[in-house]
Structure formats: structure tokens, C-alpha cells
Amino acid sequence: MGSFEVDSLEGGSIPAGTNVIGHVIVDAGAALIGATSTFGRIEVTPVIQNAQYVSGNDMGGLISFTMPRTASGLIQSVGVQFIGGATTAVNVFLFDANPTGSTFTDKSTFTIVAADEAKRINKVGLSLTPVAVVGDAVTGATIDNYAKPFNSTGTIYMAVVSTGTFTPASVTDMRVNITYQQGAQ
């Protein structure tokens, strides 16, 4: 954790025209209010199978979102869309470090080991509904104002797990996204 200190003016008055009273010393690791933040949205289209998924199946394996910085921040929203119109519900698991001990194989049973729980940001349940005009097949769900903190190593990881039985329309049917805010490095 960084630190900062304020060096105050000691003894004496400020000369006319001076616009500085002391100075601030900031350690490179400090997170300061008003520091530059990065806001953004990342969307990924993982490859899935055009075959039946059942409840508990991982969809698309372990999905990676490469962040622009390695700074910590907030996940602001999480979204899932199916271009072909799947209306199942899904659970989304987010991790701020690679959950290397768990199993993330597309169309296989999702399992997470206890050692990876500390890396998990959260789990979100999403129920997919039509998101476009009548006649368009796209379905999706987003949780906004999520505001879940993360400590980024440069990548946020996601697993999408089916909670029902359905068949995606194509191998590129699913889109996943996050919006985020990251502090200065």
C-alpha cells in the first residue's frame, strides 16, 4: 500500500504572489482520490459447441479479459448475450487471478477447488431474455451497477456455466462482456 505526506509551511509568511503552500510527497504505490482512472468495456466471443449443454456445463472454457493496466479497480457490469436466442439462465464466475486448480473445459462439468476461492471476485446469476426488437433472436442479460472490487494481475478471468439444457445456434453464438474502472498504476 502506498503512502503520502504533506510538508507544511513552517515558520514565516508566504511571499506575495506565491501560490504554493508546502508540497505533497507521494510514494509510487499510493492510490489517491482524483488520480487518473481508466474506464472501459471488453467483449469476448469464446468458441462454444453447437451441441446440447446441460445444467452445470462450462461454456467456452476459461475466458480471459486482458485489462489495459495491472492496477486494481471495480467491475461495473457483467453481460452475456446469445445471438441465436438461447433463453436459459447462466451463472457467471469472475476471478482476479488465474484459477489454475479448477476445471474449465467447454461442455464439461464445471468444478472450482477450494484453493481458487480466494481468487474469485463473485458469482452472478443471469436470466437471458430478448434484448432486441421483435423478430430479432438476440437474447441477453446484464447486471449493472455491480461495483465489485478486483486486484488485477493484468487479466480478469470468467467462467460461464449453464443452469439449464439448451443448444447454442453456432460456435460463435455467445458474447460475454465486462465494463470496468481501474485506478492509476
Question: What is the role of each PLM region?
Answer:
Residues 83-123:
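Surface-exposed turn/loop modules enriched in turn-prone residues
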Residues 24, 133-167, 174:
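Cysteine-clustered segments with highest specificity for TGF-beta superfamily mature ligands
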Residues 73-76, 90, 156:
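Residue-level detector of short, conserved catalytic/binding motifs and their immediate flanks
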Residues 2, 7, 12, 35-36, ...:
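Intrinsically disordered, low-complexity segments enriched in Ser/Pro/Gly/Ala and basic residues
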Residues 1-62, 67-83, 161, 165-185:
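Extended, low-complexity segments enriched in Ser/Thr/Gly and acidic residues that occur primarily
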Residues 112-148:
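Extended, solvent-exposed segments with strong compositional bias
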